[in-house]
Amino acid sequence: MANLNNIAYRESLGGDDDFDVVRADFRYYLSHGKGNVLAFRQLNHFTSDAPTQVNAPVQLRGYKIGQYNGYYMSSIEGEERWRFAERWTSTFFLGIACTYGGSQSCSNSKDLYPAVGAGVQYILKPKEGIVLNLEYALGKDGNYGVYLNMGYAY
């Protein structure tokens, strides 16, 4: 599954600046076993002439959105969704993001943001696919997150 979009900010429409934000989101799901899924997500976020506060943020579980930004951000994440009971699944995931552009580079470890985590899900309504999801994720430099959501992360 792919999603590509562009958000155009224009002074002529009442904005303070002219710039674009382009996002590309690619997802792939592989079913295996009884109710298990291996999921992948590759996300890209590009800005053009954007003010600093609008630059591309790291978007991985384990990091607060907006804490780490760059002109561009790319990430890849893999997740195993394992059904261990009729209404229960667990997730194990890992990923890495990179901010780049300007003085930032994916070859510099300070611009790389790894994440790892796990969670448990309860399937509230199996036919409708409604899932209650509790996950914990670790990032670098003491970053972490606890997430309680309806549905899977992606």
Please tell me what each predicted stretch does.
Residues M1-G102:
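C-terminal outer-membrane beta-barrel translocator/porin domains of Gram-negative envelope proteins
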Residues F19-R23, M73-S75, Y113-G117, G129, ...:
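Transmembrane beta-barrel architecture of outer-membrane proteins
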Residues Y28-L30, E80-W82, Y122-L124, L138, ...:
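Residue-level signature of outer-membrane beta-barrel architecture
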Residues I76-E79, S105, A115-Q121:
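Short glycine-rich, acidic/polar surface loops and turns
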Residues G78, G95, V120, L134, ...:
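Hydrophobic, well-ordered secondary-structure elements that form the walls
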Residues G101-L112:
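Small/polar, glycine/serine/threonine/aspartate-rich low-complexity segments that form flexible
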Residues G117-K127, N143-Y154:
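Outer-membrane beta-barrel "beta-signal"
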Residues E128-L138:
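Low-complexity, intrinsically disordered Gly/Pro/Thr-rich segments
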